[in-house]
UniProtKB/Swiss-Prot annotation:
SUPFAM superfamilies: Globin-like. Changing residue 139 to A: In allelic variant. Heme b binds at residues 64, 93. The modification Phosphothreonine is found at residue 13. Keywords: Acetylation, Heme, Iron, Metal-binding, Oxygen transport, Phosphoprotein, S-nitrosylation, Transport. Heterotetramer of two alpha chains and two beta chains. One of its GO terms (molecular function) is peroxidase activity. Signal peptide: none annotated. It comes from the Eukaryota. Involved in oxygen transport from the lung to the various peripheral tissues. Residues 3-147 form the Globin domain. The modification N6-acetyllysine is found at residues 60, 83, 145. This is Hemoglobin subunit beta.
Length: 147
């Protein structure tokens, strides 16, 4: 559960209304794979990840990034039940994929960077604080199966 105040919900939802999940999702996942290259081992089937340009231009990275970012939209609709919303994804990432749960935090932080880059004027310190709360809540929900 993420407790966002009314103004925090407004900040998050207003910005979310301008997010292009295809563009920003691909960028966020791509940046994760470039900045934290050891995370690439989970995406070996995606083809060429040999350089930053290859990662950022990879169609499979972009498509999966859009899918990942779409799940943040689900989070916004289910702030009171993030653990339930992400239960199946948590189980998949824990039991089948064996993803280090710290990678969820990393992705959340990369997403905040991407949002700041694209929405610099709207991404006020207050908006950043609200988004940090949201990505932390999503990260915690995704890591739930690990506990």
């Amino acid at each position: 559960m993420v407790h966002l105040s009314g103004s925090e919900k407004t900040a998050v939802t207003n910005l979310w209304g301008h997010v292009n999940v295809n563009e920003l999702g691909g960028e966020a996942l791509g940046r994760l794979l470039v900045v934290y290259p050891w995370t690439q081992r989970f995406f070996e089937s995606f083809g060429d990840l040999s350089s930053a340009d290859a990662v950022m231009g990879n169609a499979k990275v972009k498509a999966h990034g859009a899918k990942v970012l779409t799940s943040f939209g689900d989070a916004l609709k289910n702030l009171d039940n993030l653990k339930g919303t992400f239960a199946k994804l948590s189980e998949l990432h824990c039991d089948k994929l064996h993803v280090d749960p710290e990678n969820f935090n990393r992705l959340g932080n990369v997403l905040v960077v991407v949002l700041a880059r694209h929405f610099s004027k709207e991404f006020t310190p207050e908006a950043q604080a609200a988004w940090q709360k949201l990505v932390s809540g999503v990260s915690h929900a995704l890591a739930h199966k690990y506990h």
